[in-house]
Amino acid sequence: MSKNKKWLIVAISLILVGCITFTFVMARLDWDFLKLGTSKYRTQTYDITETFSDISIENNTADILFVLANDGKCRVVCYDNEKIEYQTGVSNGKLNIKPIDNRKWFEHIGINFESSRITIYLPEKELGNLFVKNSTGDIKLEKLSINSADFSVSTGKIFASDITCAGDFKTKVSTGEVFLLSTKCKNLISSGNTGDITLKNVIAQEEFSIRRSTGDIEFEACDSNNIFIKTDTGDVEGSLLSSKVFIAKTDTGSIEVPKTTTGGKCEIITDTGDIEIDIKQ
């Protein structure tokens, strides 16, 4: 038997042993991959008894969810690494939430299949100003009336549905995506690099201002008095509810916009991306 065949037999044998060992271990764990994680997680609940209108959250990896409380009591429920605590409290009418990471540097190294999350249970659906700064975690809120929103993420997603915002609704992403559904606001202001933005049934009283580098911009049945959209290589595609005076510019992409001459201004600028807009009747 040649030397190469011997090495091949050894390699195949090791692979088979590895597969058998993996199958045995996972069977003992009921095929629950979460049990392979090297970090321990726990749930921490913080009852908020003081009244507030504004919320400020600074976080890194945890998903952030805003939920209406069934019992009318406000609380913050955090599911995270057991060595991460959360500083919560109300100051000057603002609920502040911030993580305190007690891990040493080497404790950041390991296998982890868990997802951290912060759930804010709200006693009522009317709030003041929301400020959330996140990194890889998502931000999700539904069925709320707020004064203003200022959300920023790096790679996480921003999802908002059935929101009434009296003031500005701001989002900022790096590679993360933005999804806004059935939302009304005074101004929609969104900036980002490669992250896409998708809007459906979003109405801004005054202006849309959307900027992206390579991210695509899509909207359906949306409208605003004035619209400004700027992207470098991303495409712009969507439908509006009313006529606009269109100013569309692209270097190498194609342009398809209605030839309407009434309504507010809709300016769309892209370098290599395509522009395709229509008016939904």
Q: Predicted segments — roles?
A:
Residues 2-134, 140-153, 159-173, 179-191, ...:
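Acidic (Asp/Glu) and glycine-rich low-complexity loops/linkers
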Residues 195:
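Acidic (E/D-rich), amphipathic helical modules within compact regulatory domains
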Residues 180, 199, 219-220:
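Structural signature of tandem-repeat unit edges
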